[in-house]
Amino acid sequence: MKKILTLAAIVLAIGGCSGQQAETQATPVNIKSLAGDSAVTDIRPADAMPVYPARGKALERSFTDQPPLIPHKDDYKITLDKNGCLTCHSWDKAARMKATPVAKSHVIDDKGTLNGHNYFCTQCHVAQAENKAPLVENKFSTQ
């Protein structure tokens, strides 16, 4: 009985696929851009490259208890398995790499094991570069 049902299912599957023909006279699809029919006429020059502070120089903090700013790019990968910041800033590599070691407030033992609450560095620490044009107006005041 199983063989007959299996054979019938195969015949129906093949029969269902074999009688169809591909549509050869398909009409082209006209997709419009979000910009409509307007052409791009204004080509602007590329943005200036950001200038980071000199190596080994700490950036001045704007307010008390502000996390230190990162004086370099901050696109190092941070995943559950690996923290890219620790390739330079871990306690055992910081002196050799001439980098600031992870603060004692961020570790849980004398070996420099990072506390899980401080694992994702870019939650608090941000890269700072001297960009020529501000992206948004800044009304911050230290007073």
Swiss-Prot record:
Reported phenotype of the disruption mutant: Mutants exhibit 15% slower rate of nitrate reduction compared to mutants for other genes in the NAP operon. Mutants can grow on nitrate to maximum cell density earlier than wild-type. Nitrite is not detected in mutant strains but ammonium reaches detectable levels sooner than in wild-type and accumulates to same level as in wild-type. Double mutants with deletions of both NapA and NapB fail to grow on nitrate or reduce nitrate under anaerobic conditions. Double mutants for both NapB and NrfA reduces nitrate as fast as wild-type.
Binding-site positions, heme c 1: 72, 85, 88-89
Changes after translation: Binds 2 heme C groups per subunit.
Database matches in Gene3D superfamilies: Flavocytochrome C3, Chain A (1.10.1130.10)
Stimuli inducing this protein: By nitrate or fumarate under anaerobic conditions.
Family: Belongs to the NapB family.
Name used for this protein in its record: Periplasmic nitrate reductase, electron transfer subunit
Source organism (scientific name): Shewanella oneidensis (strain ATCC 700550 / JCM 31522 / CIP 106686 / LMG 19005 / NCIMB 14063 / MR-1)
Lineage: Bacteria, Pseudomonadati, Pseudomonadota, Gammaproteobacteria, Alteromonadales
